[in-house]
A protein has these predicted regions:
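Non-catalytic, surface beta->alpha helical segment in thiol-disulfide oxidoreductase systems
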Residues: 41-81
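Alpha-helical repeat scaffolds
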Residues: 82-88, 113-126, 149-163, 184-196, ...
Length: 300
């Protein structure tokens, strides 16, 4: 984001007029303490605090300039912040859609215990009112998984299948994903990915399997093989393709596997424009391939 979003003139102007901006390294100085205090779970995380240091909202992950600016304006206006949603819910007790929005906000703020409290209320409401609509139950399962309760998510997905609710095939697939993660076992998901012709499902399956293999670190050749298959499912229309290909190349460099393929992918990434991080990856791969002079040329 440093190279595009933070250098956008509109965002610089907004920050100048509305914010006091501080950049903190979460690994140095007061960073580790602030990381714990504000429950930072990923990078980049942009916290928007009021004058007393209370969190109004946060923006997690990469955002292109236009989207990032919209988020800043939304937070400044107090729209769909936690306090805004809580006020709306207080005025409309029992509104399930508001409960869902509060749950999602607590998840975004990395407060899983509070999120689960509202999730339990929604699940109880659905059960007591025999409200078994696929999208409602499916959304509920996704949220339970996000807050760290995959076993509840799996139970809900199994319920969709048992009741033969519309789109139960989707529930079956996500059940496979969650069970693979929970059991740390890729066998069923590997079988599924070999049978399905659904590209989206293949992508999701590959990424879940790759995460498990990377965590276990017991079959790096299979991880590399599946990583290549996964990135090959994306075409040049995918807006984050350069970043995806660079990530693949860096991982292959770490593993010391599929280096020629990694070089091919990093060259494709550079077709979208030169980027210092991607150039560094290319130099590293060339070096490991023994093409030292070419690596030095890239660095220079």
């Amino acid at each position: 984001m440093d190279s595009d979003t933070y250098t956008d003139e509109r965002i610089i102007e907004f920050a100048k007029n509305n914010l006091i901006s501080i950049k903190i390294d979460a690994e140095k100085g007061a960073g580790p303490e602030q990381k714990i205090k504000y429950r930072i779970g990923g990078y980049p995380t942009i916290l928007v605090l009021d004058s007393l240091g209370n969190e109004m909202d946060r923006i997690v992950g990469y955002r292109p300039p236009e989207e990032f600016l919209k988020e800043l304006i939304r937070i400044k206006n107090g729209e769909n912040t936690l306090s805004d949603l809580q006020k709306k819910y207080k005025d409309n007790l029992g509104d399930i859609s508001l409960q869902f929005n509060i749950e999602k906000k607590y998840i975004d703020l990395n407060v899983p215990d509070s999120a689960k409290k509202y999730l339990d209320l929604v699940q109880k409401y659905y059960s007591e009112n025999n409200q078994f609509v696929f999208q409602d139950l499916f959304d509920l399962s996704q949220l339970y998984n996000r807050v760290g309760f995959p076993e509840i998510a799996i139970d809900i997905l199994d319920q969709i299948i048992d009741l033969d609710i519309d789109s139960s095939e989707t529930a079956y697939f996500y059940g496979l994903l969650f069970k693979a993660k929970q059991d740390n076992n890729i066998e069923d998901l590997m079988e599924f990915v070999d049978l399905t012709d659904d590209t989206t499902r293949k992508k999701q399956s590959y990424w879940q399997i790759i995460r498990i293999l990377k965590k276990n670190a017991d079959n790096q050749s299979l991880e590399a093989e599946l990583y290549l298959k996964a990135v090959n499912l994306y075409d040049k229309k995918y807006k984050y393709l350069p970043r995806l290909l660079n990530s693949f190349a860096r991982r292959m460099s770490e593993l010391g596997l599929l280096l020629p393929e990694a070089l091919e992918k990093v060259n494709i990434a550079l077709e979208f424009g030169e980027d210092i991080k991607i150039l560094n990856t290319k130099a590293e791969i060339l070096w490991k391939l023994g093409r030292v002079d070419e690596a030095l040329e890239v660095i220079d």
